[in-house]
Amino acid sequence: MAAAATQGGRSGGLGGNSGAGGGSNCGTGSGRSGLLDKWKIDDKPVKIDKWDGSAVKNSLDDSAKKVLLEKYKYVENFGLIDGRLTICTISCFFAIVALIWDYMHPFPESKPVLALCVISYFVMMGILTIYTSYKEKSIFLVAHRKDPTGMDPDDIWQLSSSLKRFDDKYTLKLTFISGRTKQQREAEFTKSIAKFFDHSGTLVMDAYEPEISRLHDSLAVERKIK
């Protein structure tokens, strides 16, 4: 009984010391990890096949997008995506009309309508190619920063990226467009994907997030100076 009491007292003392140490660690670590905890992707590590270039690029793009939207609280604008969806919807409309018309009026009676729909479909595909090449480019995020006073138009932030096939160099570009002056500034980095993924293919946000924040902060500082 006495030995058990003594052992319990020691355990209690150790628990108290551990609690004090935990409080100290919390005080020093919360400043660094507090922001990261807010925008983990689904609170799970992002793990991909390192040899799948598309998966690598998509995971890096999604994580960069997550930082701007959740850390900096910007509002995503879906205008670019809506434009592409509109073009695709019109293209599908022509295809459906051709299908229904051919069913109701079998060939060759449906020939003029089929020809018109086929030509229209390929014209829309050409428009889509031009749209993605010159309008969308490689942009995967357009986000707005609301003016706190509500007096000036929104500032616009754009993220675009590239990763060539069979290459390990990933380029991320951040573009800032001032809502008030319409001036545009850019910052980018090119890094090996090996810097952001461990040996198992898990994205290391502690290595990736600072690179994105540096890009953002460099443009944000210029904005404040001007």
From Swiss-Prot:
Modified residues annotated as N-acetylalanine in this record: 2
Compartment list: Endoplasmic reticulum membrane
Record field: transmembrane: 87-107, 112-132
GO biological process terms on file: protein targeting to ER; signal peptide processing
Lumenal topological domain residue ranges: 108-111
Keyword tRNA processing attributed: no
Residues carrying N6-acetyllysine: 169, 191
Biased composition range(s): Gly residues: 9-26
Keywords from the named record: Acetylation, Endoplasmic reticulum, Membrane, Transmembrane, Transmembrane helix
GO CC, any one term: signal peptidase complex
Disulfide bonds: none
Annotated signal sequence range: none
Residue intervals annotated with topology Cytoplasmic: 2-86, 133-226
Membrane topology: Multi-pass membrane protein
Region annotated Disordered, chain positions: 1-26
Free-text function comment from the UniProt entry: Component of the signal peptidase complex (SPC) which catalyzes the cleavage of N-terminal signal sequences from nascent proteins as they are translocated into the lumen of the endoplasmic reticulum. Enhances the enzymatic activity of SPC and facilitates the interactions between different components of the translocation site.
UniProt family annotation: Belongs to the SPCS2 family.
Quaternary data: Component of the signal peptidase complex paralog A (SPC-A) composed of a catalytic subunit SEC11A and three accessory subunits SPCS1, SPCS2 and SPCS3. Component of the signal peptidase complex paralog C (SPC-C) composed of a catalytic subunit SEC11C and three accessory subunits SPCS1, SPCS2 and SPCS3. Within the complex, interacts with SEC11A or SEC11C and SPCS1. The complex induces a local thinning of the ER membrane which is used to measure the length of the signal peptide (SP) h-region of protein substrates.
PANTHER family: MICROSOMAL SIGNAL PEPTIDASE 25 KDA SUBUNIT, SIGNAL PEPTIDASE COMPLEX SUBUNIT 2
Protein name per the record: Signal peptidase complex subunit 2
Species name: Macaca fascicularis
